């Protein structure tokens, strides 16, 4: 049986471990890749203090097998988004051994329901090509209204 929980500070070590695993997979990094301590610390600070929710999927062995995060932001209200409340979905990941079991979909459903409770009018996300079909199957659509300026 898989349990789905909202992460708290007590889950921080498992949460960071899961995030680093996901980043290695998505970025094709070797298993022994060592993340910069500043990067890990910044991730911890984000999870501790940010306006976000992270759902963890935990198996019977008490191991995180999936995670998904929703970051909440407020913008100036517009006609199409009268509450000004938006969200950005990130870090959706299921361990390869547990894929195709509905875990990502369940985590996404939990986060979408919370977003609705918070009066969010739009959820955006960045996706890999591999994930695109999954998000489309969950009702997400390509957007032509977004542009990005990279400030790095």
Predicted regions and their residues:
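A short beta-loop-alpha structural element at the N-terminal edge
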Residues: 3-17
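Conserved acetyl-CoA-binding loop of GNAT-fold acetyltransferases
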Residues: 6, 120, 136-146
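Conserved GNAT-fold acetyl-CoA-binding loop/helix
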Residues: 23-43
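A short helix-loop-beta-strand connector motif used in the catalytic cores of GNAT acetyltransferases and
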Residues: 44-56, 88
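Conserved beta-strand in the GNAT
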Residues: 56, 63-72, 88, 93
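Conserved acetyl-CoA pyrophosphate-binding loop and the N-cap/start of the following alpha-helix
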Residues: 98-110
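Conserved GNAT acetyl-CoA-binding A-motif
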Residues: 108, 115-127
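Conserved beta-strand-loop-alpha-helix junction that forms the acyl-donor binding cleft
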Residues: 123-133, 148-152
